[in-house]
Amino acid sequence: MEDKEEKKAPSVIDRYFTRWYRTDLKGKPCEDHCILQHSNRICVITLAESHPIFQNGRKIKNINYQISDGCSRLKNKVSGKSKRGGQFLTEFAPLCRITCTDEQEFTIFSCIRGRLLEVNEVILNKPDLLMEKPSTEGYIAVILPKFEESKSVTEGLLTREQYEEILTKRNQQEVPC
């Protein structure tokens, strides 16, 4: 009998979502974000595995969805089938600020235009989820792009292959993250 390699079944994320990436957001080296796009247009904003939060054994001290005095992502309320009432976000709209125990602060951005459906309030009390399960329970927010923009929303984003090429180049150049 011939030895067959056991193939691991794809995860739910890999099966139902397409991964897109935005690197060096706002010119900050290695501050990479990952956008998980479902076939129904919904996008889940997460941190890419190369983000500095995951480097050098950092620990998260605080996550704050209060963007400014008059704007808190926690106050976002949507209702109805078409999700009316959600805050509209541009590509560079801040979603939250994450402070690490070394006092380094990172602003997480939406990366795409669309309506904010929800933010992950669970990570406020369990910030370790962001480190342990960034693509599932440790997500940042869920955004719904406008229907007419749902195809163009990925323009300017990188595929998994393009992202891995950038990571390879960084490793060769030894760019500090």
Swiss-Prot record:
GO terms for molecular function: actin filament binding; actin monomer binding. InterPro entries: Abitram, GCV_H/Fam206, Single_hybrid_motif. It comes from the Eukaryota. GO terms for biological process: dendrite morphogenesis; regulation of actin filament polymerization; regulation of filopodium assembly. Its main location: nucleus. Keywords: Cell projection, Nucleus. It is found in: Nucleus speckle; Cell projection, Lamellipodium; Nucleus; Cell projection, Growth cone. Transmembrane segments: none annotated. GO terms for cellular component: dendrite; filopodium tip; growth cone; lamellipodium; nuclear speck; nucleus. Belongs to the ABITRAM family. PANTHER family: PROTEIN ABITRAM. May regulate actin polymerization, filopodia dynamics and arborization of neurons. This is Protein Abitram.
